[in-house]
Curated annotation (Swiss-Prot):
This is Long form salivary protein D7L1. The keyword NAD does not apply. It comes from Anopheles gambiae. GO terms for cellular component: extracellular space. Disulfide bonds join 37-73, 69-128, 178-211, 252-263. InterPro entries: PBP/GOBP, PBP_GOBP_sf. The lineage of its organism: Eukaryota, Metazoa, Ecdysozoa, Arthropoda, Hexapoda. PANTHER family: GEO07291P1-RELATED (PTHR11857:SF43), ODORANT BINDING PROTEIN-RELATED (PTHR11857). Keywords: Disulfide bond, Hemostasis impairing toxin, Platelet aggregation inhibiting toxin, Secreted, Signal, Toxin, Vasoactive, Vasodilator. Belongs to the PBP/GOBP family. Pfam families: PBP_GOBP.
Length: 311
């Protein structure tokens, strides 16, 4: 009986962990996936805009290596494909549907068909090309369904934002969003402190910084994502600081967002960290910033653009 009880407990734990892994994406999270995959896979050169326009209309063209890797990136971000196990994840489709079905108005029968279609796919070696070729027929048949489920239509997204004001809005920076979320009535004052990089060791300020770090994708439930922090230094043309940034973060005694934030602000890279953080704040109000071909033009230009953002 004891063994049976232990086995049941383990199975329940595994089920709970699996359920937690498939949390439905809200519009902000889906938008981030699309734009980050644009950033990572759009080619430079004259064809960049053509790729971007085509993908934004949910057309997986042209059928080439660039589009193949963009599709794999997007499927992984939307939790429809798992890179670690190299398998498609049909079980996540109804989870996403159930969370927003009152807004998307997609027929459950169509969702079931999409789920069944995904369940029959084989990712092969897991290469971009094999994942793309496996998924393309499913996409072509069910693009109308998946586009609604995964927040690809303007009308349904607008309804969700109206009904759920707790979701970060487009054109709202994560500094502004997190100040309001974590500091409530003191949001304006807290926003100023966040923008001015003042250290305020309070529970509210710590919560605000945790919100910002998660919004910037510096952290998730598994901990700090050092590569994401380093990436922001690279984007302000400070890739030479990578060893020092990694060293600062590795030697930080705490493990919370506020701790890492404080360590960076009290390190030799503090000024560059401020610049990187400012630049990410600007981009957090428009996830398509880099995909549109914009680049870092220095701290003064960033501050000038930040002034245009509404708190």
């Amino acid at each position: 009986m004891i063994v049976t009880g232990v086995l049941l407990f383990i199975l329940l734990e595994l089920f709970a962990q699996g359920s937690q892994a498939f949390k439905a994406l809200d519009p902000e999270e889906a938008w981030y996936v699309y734009e980050r995959c644009h950033e990572d896979h759009l080619p430079s050169g004259p064809n960049r805009e053509t790729y971007l326009k085509t993908w934004k209309f949910w057309k997986l063209e042209p059928n080439d290596a660039v589009t193949h890797c963009y599709v794999k990136c997007t499927l992984a971000g939307l939790q429809m494909y798992d890179e670690k196990t190299n398998t498609f994840k049909p079980e996540t489709v109804p989870v996403q549907h159930e969370a927003y079905k009152s807004f998307t108005e997609v027929e459950s029968s169509k969702v079931n068909e999409l789920q069944q279609a995904l369940s029959s796919l084989n990712a092969g070696s897991g290469s971009c090309a094999e994942v793309f070729n496996a998924y393309l027929p499913v996409h072509n048949k069910y693009v109308g369904v998946s586009r609604k489920i995964y927040h690809g239509t303007v009308d349904s997204v607008a309804k969700i934002y109206e009904a759920k004001p707790e979701i970060k809005k487009q054109e709202e920076s994560f500094f502004a969003y997190c100040a309001k979320k974590a500091l409530g009535a003191n949001g304006k004052e807290g926003y100023t402190k966040l923008r001015d990089y003042e250290l305020a060791d309070s529970a509210e300020f710590r919560n605000a910084m945790d919100c910002v770090f998660r919004g910037f994708r510096y952290m998730d439930d598994s901990g700090l994502k050092v590569d994401e922090v380093v990436r922001d230094f690279n984007l302000i043309n400070k890739s030479d600081l990578e060893p020092e940034v990694r060293s600062v973060l590795a030697s930080c005694t705490g493990t919370q967002a506020y701790d890492y934030y404080s360590c960076l602000l009290n390190s030799p890279v503090k000024e560059d960290f401020r610049n990187a953080f400012y630049f990410h704040e600007l981009r957090s109000a428009n996830y398509g910033y880099l995909a549109m071909g914009k680049v870092y033009e220095g701290p003064e230009k960033v501050k000038e653009e930040l002034k245009k953002l509404n708190y």
